[in-house]
């Protein structure tokens, strides 16, 4: 049986994803002693894991290097769809928010400048509102953009809001809820349908058990 390759997002989401996979009966013990390794093989099941950056999960799945990926909905919303989105894993929950300094006026007709890591999501949001804005893409911490006068407001993902508060920002609008999703390579779903749907069934059961706690 061909081993399924699962691409996981490195960092905070990785921990939650591994915990959920283990609840679903997936052997993740090979990842206990990671050191600098990025590829792991289960010794008891035909499954391998690849640890990559969030944006690269989609790339590995798109090109068939990974059969399955676990990645935040924010990453999926920002990129073109080249995969099947199979399951909301209900981990890594946060939301897209519009935030700025307390003196920001979201109802102003003046053309606004918005700083964000997510230009596609931001453009879609303001287009739906019928607003013409200038989008500035920032790769690092966007919270300082309104404080330093680079932008009028920001759009970013927010979990607790503590980082915004620490930088003197307030939330003006909660836009879209975000959570981690299970994505599957289109060709892999055809070739490994039984294995993949068995994994999905196990994950769905683990999610249900978590909900009833």
From Swiss-Prot:
Its main location: cytoplasm. GO terms for molecular function: ATP binding; ATP phosphoribosyltransferase activity. Its EC number is 2.4.2.17. Pathway: Amino-acid biosynthesis; L-histidine biosynthesis; L-histidine from 5-phospho-alpha-D-ribose 1-diphosphate: step 1/9. It catalyses: 1-(5-phospho-beta-D-ribosyl)-ATP + diphosphate = 5-phospho-alpha-D-ribose 1-diphosphate + ATP. InterPro entries: ATP_PRibTrfase_cat, ATP_PRibTrfase_CS, ATP_PRibTrfase_HisG, ATP_PRibTrfase_HisG_short. GO terms for biological process: L-histidine biosynthetic process. It is an enzyme of class 2 (transferase). Keywords: Amino-acid biosynthesis, ATP-binding, Cytoplasm, Glycosyltransferase, Histidine biosynthesis, Nucleotide-binding, Transferase. It is found in: Cytoplasm. Coiled coil: none annotated. GO terms for cellular component: cytoplasm. Heteromultimer composed of HisG and HisZ subunits. Catalyzes the condensation of ATP and 5-phosphoribose 1-diphosphate to form N'-(5'-phosphoribosyl)-ATP (PR-ATP). Has a crucial role in the pathway because the rate of histidine biosynthesis seems to be controlled primarily by regulation of HisG enzymatic activity. Lacks the C-terminal regulatory region which is replaced by HisZ. PANTHER family: ATP PHOSPHORIBOSYLTRANSFERASE, ATP PHOSPHORIBOSYLTRANSFERASE ATP-PRTASE. This is ATP phosphoribosyltransferase.
